[in-house]
């Protein structure tokens, strides 16, 4: 039960027949009001209103109180039916419900009023078949039939066999319109036939508790011969079901009420549901067909005198009681238990919550689903356009038939598949242009695709050269019919030569009026000092002379003159064009040229770009500029995108236009398009056809790719779902091959199963992909399975055998699993670790929205490299990771995409305040029998002991574990969210060694670690790393700070059941492993598997190579060091002593209390005022589903205001915040976003929890301000 509403009235009520019904309530007669008031009211309640369910939508005072109310179904002239009231003074009044609701005037709504009854009217009901016919019953045994269309004189149904003093209930038969029943205080129930106008049957019952005094009667919802009665005798509180074909005795007797039953209601939609209420203050739900009680609803404080289902919403019912309440609730109980509602641990709070919490809950003895929740049909649609039909013959045998269902539009998808299969795209394009293209944009797209398919990219910009006139060549002359060149071979010049300058006559070096600068210039020229001469020309602003001199000069001189020319003519459009041509770089042309001349810019891109990738990039950039221009033409941008191969961008543009395309399809009123789903399928088909045609024209192969591929992939996946649902599996599968595996895996598996083809589980596909990526690394999972399941053969090459480990507590196991993740292969290709290197990630893996995003502004963390154990290793750097298709760099609680602007600039996460930490990488044993592994070399000093040829381990183990010196404390400014840590590191005790009865016998001569907690590394402990000038020195790093962020998804491993879902933070008090020769350098062995089973593989990041050191799960925190001094000995439980907890440091006290705004400086006050105004403007518009986001945003903004009030924000940030506030008030959201990003990048040490709130305010304001 879920309580929907509670009306504080002592009223009788009636439901309207709407799906979301109204409730009419009238003050009930015979009850004393809590205020001892004698007034009476008639009210209408909209209990399903989302805004106002606590107040009536209509209320009016009436002269007398009601015994009953009835609300008819709509009929002729009454669009919302009639509301009838039975008054205690014998009056029956009728109101037009439609007029009453619209005018809120009781007098205007009244259509008839009658005093035909001589006493109180106790009951009335409208006929369920003839909605305008009403029956009323009351004192003196009077029963009248009313015709509410004409309001003619009401008539009695006939003469009663045994007259009764009072009629308490009347009820119409639900199947036969002229049959009704009445009951009263005479102890019997009468059945009346209006055709014969007489009482035809007489029902009574006497049981062990005495004679039943019938108080209520109700007919079966669908069977005309069955009805039910209730007795209000406290000694005989029974509910009796009757079949009139045997009226001598009741069919079922329902016992459960402890006192008399006052009301019944038989559900019209489900005959197996019956409500009852009575003098014992209870309301029961029954199955009257089986005669069993289903459940009991919370009791009231006084008699529950009326209960009724809502006619059109039977899962809702109302109960009225004399304790002054009408409770509306659901028949199903979905409310939480009382223990979850009252969960306070404080005694005072517990009693306070208990007193205000609804503690009563329904109790159901039998669980039964109502009919409206059951499947009403024996026909069902199946995946792949299948129709399953179940038929039952006369003998009761069922047959199942599976047919093919041909949906609308399936012919088009079949034709599309044929065209794709036969590469018949020219026919597809022609059909699109000849058919109905719906709108001009779609037609233009197909025309461009046609030109592109026929003449290539060059034809798209041919109009840019229409004004050029080519010079007439000799070949042209010959074609035009002029004389041949050879006819005049000996008669004259074969071609016109250019005139060459030949100096003539005498001249003076210096004229009479020559100035000194000119003389100096001439002297420099005569001395062949070209560079100085050019500089002198430029000083004298003789640019032409400088250009001529530079022709014979060096490249530097030419560049000098060019720069002078371009600076002098920087405002000249020809100069800008010459600059782009001179530099052979069209970046300036693409970025700043007016987009009105986009075709000329495109020609320039074609002329000066050197490779296809640069050409595509510039064309795509030009398309972006055209699309963003105020008067930008969409079709011009489409041409640039198509020419530049920007399928992801052009597809996004097409996807944005899909809703309009669907609306236009629906407006055509075609026979093929009759519903929005038909329009959606055709729009998606048209989109897919354009994508497929473009890929064919440009000879694109492989999967979809690009930075904006996600919307394209989702649209293709939607199309695949639709056509696969129609049974076009081949077409769906063809497009699934083009999708990245991140999108197509599950759907591909589903289609392959539907077509009964062999299917490889998605998990196996991913695992094989990971195996390819991590090929050089050892598979510790295989190692463990091999060593534990099969003994090593005698002729096998010597390999290292890790000791088998006894079961460990969950925390220890997890620490060991983390270390095993980071163990490189001794004999594989060692990959060098660089400062700031990050683990490889799978580009298709789902991003964890709760993990902190990688920050490109964070200083790179230098990573310590372990010392070489034995032999020589060659370093092969890992390939660069492929860019992920999903750039999910938002915070965990950012707004959904609904509030995000479509053209918002990409945002980067702020730099983290935690300093990088140098992390030693542990060493692992090679995989047993791993392919591609060379045989192990003989054991050398400082290496892990190897297994002999007989397969038994040697007795000695040694390793060198080298750690960098301890970090020194340095002074560094931290963010306000930084957690202070102590630099004290107490010693950690050595854990007790454990053994495993399944491990081979091993003895150990392990030396004890030295007393010193730290040791200097050897000079040759690691290869020399390239120094990063921006990374902090290894010797100047703070102790690691514990960050309690959830680990990223690509670091989460497939842990066993006992492994927590997060990695434990490093113990800041633990002593690093010793550098002496001991067992400390040996990587912890895997947990021992159960007998007879192979050990599970170690957890590893999805899509990352095992030879790469895995970053710790916590941001900036290295994994815990391996256990010190582990050895194999007699069985013992592993004990881990916890270091003493240090006292937490007291937080820094703020200058002013939280919430104080009186100390905000003048220069910061506009920030507070503007942001507050915007916040208050959008708060009322925030949808209810995003209310938590709005509350969180306001709390974070208050943190910013507190910082402003305490003057804790630098002037640089304040200036940028002023720009954000100004941009928000002027609704320049793009600029506000850009400035907010600038704050994150330039002042990362100052942004704290408030920055996310500011970002959300900008996003919400863009949607609602």
Swiss-Prot record:
Component of the coat protein complex II (COPII) which promotes the formation of transport vesicles from the endoplasmic reticulum (ER). The coat has two main functions, the physical deformation of the endoplasmic reticulum membrane into vesicles and the selection of cargo molecules. InterPro entries: SEC31-like, SRA1/Sec31, Vinculin_CS, WD40/YVTN_repeat-like_dom_sf, WD40_repeat_CS, WD40_repeat_dom_sf, WD40_rpt. Residues 794-810, 1062-1071, 1083-1101 have a biased composition (Pro residues). Residues 1004-1023 have a biased composition (Polar residues). Residues 457-480 have a biased composition (Basic and acidic residues). GO terms for cellular component: actin cytoskeleton; COPII vesicle coat; endoplasmic reticulum exit site; endoplasmic reticulum membrane. Belongs to the WD repeat SEC31 family. It is found in: Cytoplasmic vesicle, COPII-coated vesicle membrane; Endoplasmic reticulum membrane. WD repeats lie at residues 6-46, 61-105, 116-156, 162-202, 209-252, 256-296, 299-339, 380-403. Keywords: Cytoplasmic vesicle, Endoplasmic reticulum, ER-Golgi transport, Membrane, Protein transport, Repeat, Transport, WD repeat. The COPII coat is composed of at least 5 proteins: the SEC23/24 complex, the SEC13/31 complex, and the protein SAR1. SEC13 and SEC31 make a 2:2 tetramer that forms the edge element of the COPII outer coat. The tetramer self-assembles in multiple copies to form the complete polyhedral cage. Interacts (via WD 8) with SEC13. The keyword Transcription regulation does not apply. This is Protein transport protein SEC31. Residues 811-824, 865-875, 901-931, 939-951, 969-987 have a biased composition (Low complexity). The lineage of its organism: Eukaryota, Fungi, Dikarya, Ascomycota, Saccharomycotina. SMART domains: WD40 (SM00320). Residues 457-485, 765-784, 793-1163 are annotated as: Disordered. Its main location: membrane. It is a peripheral membrane protein. GO terms for biological process: cell adhesion; COPII-coated vesicle cargo loading; endoplasmic reticulum organization; positive regulation of ER to Golgi vesicle-mediated transport; positive regulation of protein exit from endoplasmic reticulum; protein transport. The gene is PGA63. One of its GO terms (molecular function) is structural molecule activity.
